[in-house]
Curated annotation (Swiss-Prot):
Keywords: Ribonucleoprotein, Ribosomal protein, RNA-binding, rRNA-binding. Binds as a heterodimer with protein bS6 to the central domain of the 16S rRNA, where it helps stabilize the platform of the 30S subunit. It comes from Mycoplasma capricolum subsp. capricolum (strain California kid / ATCC 27343 / NCTC 10154). This is Small ribosomal subunit protein bS18. NCBIfam families: S18.
Length: 75
């Protein structure tokens, strides 16, 4: 049997690519891209965001949840 080699594509930081400096908690459509189907915040290794952007993203998602713009759990 021959083993297939899987090429991993390089993850690109979405916020640097689109020149987004500030992640707004009121931009719900943007934040939904970084939430799993269960409602959890996706980690950096999956999204490809930088450390600084991931911190801002997590803070924005938590603020949106607190303001009831995003649900805590999706059923």
């Amino acid at each position: 049997m021959q083993v297939k080699k899987i090429k991993k594509r390089k993850k690109v930081n979405f916020f640097q690519k689109n020149n987004i400096k500030y992640i707004d908690y009121k931009d719900v459509e943007l934040l939904k891209k970084f939430i799993s189907p269960n409602g959890q915040i996706l980690p950096r290794r999956i999204t490809g965001t930088s450390l600084k952007d991931q911190r801002q993203l997590a803070l924005a998602i938590k603020r949106a949840r607190q303001m009831a713009l995003l649900p805590y759990v999706i059923e």
